[in-house]
Amino acid sequence: VHLSSEEKGLITSLWGKIDIEQTGGEALGRLLIVYPWTSRFFDHFGDLSSAKAVLGNAKVLAHGAKVLVSFGDAIKNLDNLKGTFAKLSELHCDKLHVDPENFKLLGNVLVICLAEHFGKDFTIDAQVAWQKLVAGVANALAHKYH
């Protein structure tokens, strides 16, 4: 993924304002609610039977924060996403057998969460930059599958 210096600036400036725990938990929670088939990878998380159960599930919130911390690693290494996510790609492919399409879904849900949290501060240019980033992360996570 090629990001201009302006796009990198938009990503890093917004990243500094994100509440990792809240936004990460919300993004993973939304993924599980909007795309319920993704919950099969989280059977060990307990009750995921309703939107309320998902959004109140401590394991969902904690794992969502962990996922967003990984996005922080991406932001620190925007020019080497494949290298940054090599081990996670291997884990998700070889051990967890996650459908790589789910990485794209999560990225898009994250962008929706950012738009909701930041409103008009999440400009079209910011969305373009973040869409490129989440696509790059999804690609890097899917790398081991190819």
From Swiss-Prot:
Coiled coil: none annotated. This is Hemoglobin subunit beta. Heterotetramer of two alpha chains and two beta chains. One of its GO terms (cellular component) is blood microparticle. It comes from Potorous tridactylus (Potoroo). Keywords: Acetylation, Heme, Iron, Metal-binding, Oxygen transport, Phosphoprotein, S-nitrosylation, Transport. Heme b binds at H63, H92. Red blood cells. The modification N6-acetyllysine is found at K59, K82, K144. The gene is HBB. It holds the Pfam family Globin. The modification Phosphothreonine is found at T12.
